[in-house]
Amino acid sequence: MSKINKLEHIRNIGICAHIDAGKTTTTERILYYTGKSHKIGEVHEGGATMDWMEQEQERGITITSAATTCKWQDKVINIIDTPGHVDFTIEVERSLRVLDGAVAVFDGVAGVEPQSETVWRQADKYNVPRMCFVNKMDRMGADFYKCVDMIKDRLGAKSLILQLPIGIEENFKGIINLIKMKAVIWKDESLGAEYFEEDIPTDMQDKAAEYRARLLDMTVELDDTIMERYLSGEEITEEEIKILIRKGTIEAKFYPVLCGSAFKNKGVQPLLDAIVDFLPSPIDIGIVKGIEVSTSEEKDFPISITEPFSALAFKIMNDPFVGSLTFIRIYSGKITSGASVVNTVKNKREKIGRMLLMHANNREDIKEASAGDIVALAGLKDTSTGDTLSDIDTQVVLERMEFPEPVIELAVEPKSTADQEKMGLALSRLAAEDPSFKVSTDHETGQTVIKGMGELHLEIIIDRMRREFKVEANIGAPQVAYRETITTACEIDYTHKKQSGGAGQFARVKIIFEPLKDVIDLKDEDKNKTFVFESKIVGGAVPKEYIPGVEKGLNNIRETGIVAGYPMIDFKATLVDGAFHDVDSSVLAFEIAAKGAFREGMQKGNPKLLEPIMKVEVITPDEYMGDIIGDLNSRRGQIQSMDPRGNAQVVTAYVPLAEMFGYVNTLRSLSQGRAQFSMIFSHYDQVPSQVADIIKAKK
């Protein structure tokens, strides 16, 4: 391995696409033909090597990006197999951040599907060079040319066709290689391991010549000298064509398109050749952006084995045998097991325990790794996804990954109180693995609330809690965090007096209650508060030592409003006058008086129920705009803007959180899964009276 493990010989690639396009099957075939798997795993039999989690084998979908290393010709290929379900886009995003190139797999029947669009946009964000593999050419209804048109129309991508299919559907038997101008036919009886080249069938020669001319027209544009030779009728060599295709792919001038049927073992070896020939090595990427810790300056750092060590942690995974594994992509320098490095994001030293090369869920211990490698480290204590590991003497922080906010939440509780601690540990471990999964405690209900990217995402979290941590949980729908406020100002004069033998109680307070939005002279430090208390007592009408009792009483009682028992927010209470008794007054008496004044003030202040309003952004193809806007309006949404973004539309709206539960599924069905959305908390607003009546009735 070490002899050939030089930067120009490494290909760090991802295989990504929509669910069911055949990514995992394609990866399985790659592992088979590169000699890593002795038998081919079939997804529909639950035996694929890459799909190593139990849930994945049951569902036949890829949930976590398994990393694996294999070898083709004299090149090392590190493959990340990514999930295709929309709930797991974070896994795709994490992978793309550390890859140099990607293979986008398309279903030859369905063409460009919704998740294909999402993944393509994510790859654009990280400027990842990529090629396309039109899979399932043996299936009924497969149409290579239609799929290529969809790549152009839906993704706005300039495709460079390198192969044409020979035969369609069940008669698909091979491809035409437009670079060599030869037909490649696979022998079925050898599981696709054997294939032979022959002349292009007579009935396809004209079409092959037409597409070969297109290929040359697009590639020679990249080199003026070769273009002049081409225009003067000179023959361009196969090697020159390959160099131009590589240049155009790395610069994203176009995207090479290949075809085949991974399941039927046709087209995989030419795909491997293309990965090696056209996708970039770490040297082609050249630099990585980061910040030099000593100067706080942003710089471009060269990707090189001779530079000081730097790496990005892009995934944390719990391994049943090794414990916590941190997957890293090394950008510069080298590292040995047992070495000490620094986590520059957390400013903590880490000691490398075991260092592993991963093959799905099998592992191989290694002693050293260097720039370009993707390896798993055991024994790290403080490193989380997105952190930088760096040389202790020359510290850098690499560009961080961005993670979307979760959009769906559920309340969970253990089925037995004995499991409470175990559940807390399980959830914190799972949250450490997955930045798009968050855990919080609702301070009002005491419930543990889990948040994720979709219902399937949370289902799998709960399933993993049960299988890996042996914690059974009850799940429920979370409650919306309603609030209450007053809408008009009022002045309350309240006296608390108690005389019934023994020490008496006496306190009088005069308090002005007013909505915060109406306060003209609000101090800067109070502008982000939901409750403000001020004392304007002069002349000792209420002694200084009793005033904290007034504030404490108001703070305690405002947790339970009078409309439906929700906390009161967005109001100011000003203590303007009062009276006390030398013997009977106390802090407690003024606390009780303040509570009495609050109850009266809230009644007179025209109280209203408030609800959280979310800022919702929907990205959708044009054709679904009408349905999506109609649906948002029916959810009491207020449309703020509609703007074009690339070949999609972005709708921004403010929608009550109570109306957004289950929206992810509605949006999928409205847009056939092609639209995506994000939402963040914006503000609290009044609940319409007819809705408020329903909420009060439920309390």
Curated annotation (Swiss-Prot):
Annotated GTP binding sites: 17-24, 81-85, 135-138
UniProt keyword annotations, A-Z: Cytoplasm, Elongation factor, GTP-binding, Nucleotide-binding, Protein biosynthesis
Compartments (UniProt record): Cytoplasm
GO cellular component, one term: cytoplasm
Location, primary (coarse class): cytoplasm
All copies of domain tr-type G, residue ranges: 8-283
GO molecular function: GTP binding; GTPase activity; translation elongation factor activity
Domain of life, source organism: Bacteria
UniProt keyword Methyltransferase, yes or no: no
InterPro entries, per database record: EF-G-like_DII, EFG_II, EFG_III, EFG_III/V, EFG_IV, EFG_V, EFG_V-like, G_TR_CS
Gene Ontology process terms (BP): ribosome disassembly
Signal sequence bounds: none
Keyword Ubl conjugation: no
Function per UniProt: Catalyzes the GTP-dependent ribosomal translocation step during translation elongation. During this step, the ribosome changes from the pre-translocational (PRE) to the post-translocational (POST) state as the newly formed A-site-bound peptidyl-tRNA and P-site-bound deacylated tRNA move to the P and E sites, respectively. Catalyzes the coordinated movement of the two tRNA molecules, the mRNA and conformational changes in the ribosome.
HAMAP family associated with the record: EF_G_EF_2_B (MF_00054_B)
Stated family: Belongs to the TRAFAC class translation factor GTPase superfamily. Classic translation factor GTPase family. EF-G/EF-2 subfamily.
Protein known as: Elongation factor G
Species assigned in the record: Rickettsia typhi (strain ATCC VR-144 / Wilmington)
